[in-house]
Amino acid sequence: MTDVDDITTARRWIILGCSLLAALTTTCVVSGVAYLIPTLHTDAGLTLTQASALAAIPTVGLMAATIPWGILLDRYGERRILLLSLSISLAGATGAAVAASADASYAVVGAALFVGGLGSGAANGASGRIVVGWFPAHQRGTAMGIRQMAQPLGIGVCALTMPVVAASSGPAAALAIPAVVTAAGLVAVVVGITDPPRRPAPASTVGNPPPRTNPYRDNSFLARIHIVSMLLVIPQSMLWTFVPTWLIVAHGWSPAGAGTLITVTQIIGALGRIVAGRWSDAWMSRMRPVRVIAVAGVAAMSALAIADWFDSPLAPALMAVASVISVADNGLAFTAIAEYVGPEWSGRGLAVQNTGQYLVSAATTPLLGALIATVGFPIAFAATALAPLVATPLVPRDRMREPDELVDA
């Protein structure tokens, strides 16, 4: 295993970049189907609720496997587990595209999407050990912000390509896009991922090390972060899933125009995660920025609901603002968890974080689809604003970091 002192600064950032690409595959496999909802709804004859349920299937697979993947990451390291998990994800994504091209039933396509979701869980939990193991504390917020660009960038890739390909060549051709991205991520893991060294035991305990305690038993800090993140993911999931339908079906945008706006929004959101990470490094706090972001989320979703109710031309711009705000907190929560639990528990800690968020996404996607079909988008936007409102007072105070560092500045 490579020693910290033997690795260059450039190599650390290359490892982080490869981890970003690996995580981007998860977003494409799990969230990409949402960009086929307009085509499935208007051309394939599915109701909005049925299309939303199909789009949620990869999330169910991901959620079922994320914690087991986290345990394996903590035990065996990131490189080997990512190679295995992305291979499974690639098989599922490829199977879904092949099944759709063969006009197989939606049950068969859904089964393949489920397998793709099962394989996608490891990449999300892998970043904690890389960030804590390879980066000093004053760079971790920025590093995790860069790593967390994977979600909005993955959404941008899907938004820019999948609706256009589906409209011109059908859903089967569009389903090949997540498979191609996953293949690229697998190559990145092979070429670029190196596991950081494990934290050495203190000299006084060598030969008789104390048992590793469960960080969840110490206090409510981790539980509160998980709950807050589960609430804050609701606006993010809603916007990522239904904005294409909102723009194309409700407002008459072309798939190309909608995809371009969403892609630009996601790129800005990705950069916003880096800004949030730098902000948290400057404040030496992960939770205070999360609290500010939650309040901003309430304001943005409420403004979007009002603008859409009155058919304001400002609604698309407000959607973009709300989307950027909705993704800004993720890296901060991930960094706080990884720092608190340490490298030995980062896989499990981030697995619990991801499972909670994806559980909420999977549960709320069909419900929001039904709500939109019943009362329309403005009321659904307003209802979504309640989630960050509830989350704001639940944000915990920062916990003290451990004084030891694995790496030098």
Give residue ranges: language-model regions.
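Helix-loop-helix hairpin linking two adjacent transmembrane segments in secondary transporters
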Residues: 147-195
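Flexible cytoplasmic inter-helical loops of multi-pass small-molecule transporters
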Residues: 190-214, 403-409
